[in-house]
Amino acid sequence: LMLKTLAGVAVLATLFGCATPAHDSAAGGPIALKAMGSFHVGGREVELKGRPVKDMVFTPGGAPARIDPNGVYQVEQMYVQYFVPQAGQGQLPLLLWHGGGLTGVTYETTPDGREGWLNYFLRRGWTVYNSDAVERGRSGWAQYPDIFPTDPVFLTKNNPFERFRIGDGPGSYN
């Protein structure tokens, strides 16, 4: 058993020695998936009526497009993308649920380009569900103030770092 363990460590050391730099997202090699997909959870339909039709130009010099905001909208749903690894372990999947006004992309990579928690758990055989909460990311936004009653919140680039005390500064977890 000891000899097999040492041989395994030698193989891993060789593989890691040949790996690309740590900032390269492919550093751990390809991830083999059995399945991946997405779905929405919850939500409701809302119908808008009596709103003015607008002509808008989306591309400089382009032809105007007529936008009619009247109709049925799907709102307040959560978007979930799932990944099932080829060689799975664990009886239950792992749900990555962000907070603080962020999105599921929080778990895909780190700010400096390294792999995030999504790949970390996939590489260890866990089925992972990565969510975008209501009114965030790929879950979509509802019109304000017609459907969603409060102003949308937009965060600066530094806001999460300051709020969660990451990096340099007083009270930071450096």
Each language-model region and where it sits:
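Flexible, surface-exposed loop/gating regions in the mature catalytic domains
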Residues: S172
